[in-house]
Amino acid sequence: MVAIDDADISREKAALRKSVIARRNEMNPAVRAQKSAAICREVVEQLETTFGQAGSASGKQPLVGLFSALGSEVDLRYVVRHAQHVGWRIALPVMVLQEEAPGYTMLFVDVDYKTALLRQEAFLAKPAKNLEPSDFDFERFPLVSPDELDALVMPLVAFDSQGGRLGYGGGNYDRYLPQLRENCWVSGVAFDEQCVPRVPRAGFDLTIPQVIHA
């Protein structure tokens, strides 16, 4: 019975994913850019408040996990430019084959501002691209452990008002979120057009503390 329920949930997710991505793709590019800017401003405001409350006595630069937009996702380059202005470090995800884990694993690596803004590297131009360890320059882009992140901004396919979130189906963030520190600031970002009445949820699906949307 459980297997049937899980299969039903998977089918429901797939249908919702296809529908919402199509709706997001149909947004006017100018409107999408305006909304991305509004979302980024709110992200920056909340991060400034969070990092200000944490204090800067240690002189440690906050490390913020972001993402390079895939297709019609929210464009976070405004946040990157602000990070450059105030001195926050940024980390971005890359999909790399790991010997100790089956398949490809989402890792975060330290990325310089110029590279993040230009998005010419393969793992930024095509964020879903799977890479072999030998194909990735870990010396140029050092690995960041989850407990190093002070904040994480996540992409979403769909979300609801109860904390439900729908991704692309790989479970990457479901596996990554439990590895973060308890005091790591976490938020999803999405357009209002991606909000749905209810995101189908299986037992292993994690909710998200908040979604910044416009």
Question: How should these model regions be labeled?
Answer:
Residues 90, 152-154:
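Conserved alpha/beta enzyme-core scaffold
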Residues 67, 155, 214:
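Conserved residues at the C-terminal ends of beta-strands
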Residues 75-81, 163-177:
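Short Gly/Thr/Asp-enriched flexible loops that form oxyanion-binding sites at enzyme active sites
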Residues 70-72, 157-161:
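Short glycine-rich anion-binding loops that position phosphate/pyrophosphate groups of nucleotides
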Residues 2-144:
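N-terminal active-site beta-alpha-beta segment that forms phosphate/nucleotide-binding
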Residues 1-11, 15, 22-25, 134-152, ...:
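Surface-exposed, charge/polar-rich loops and edge strands
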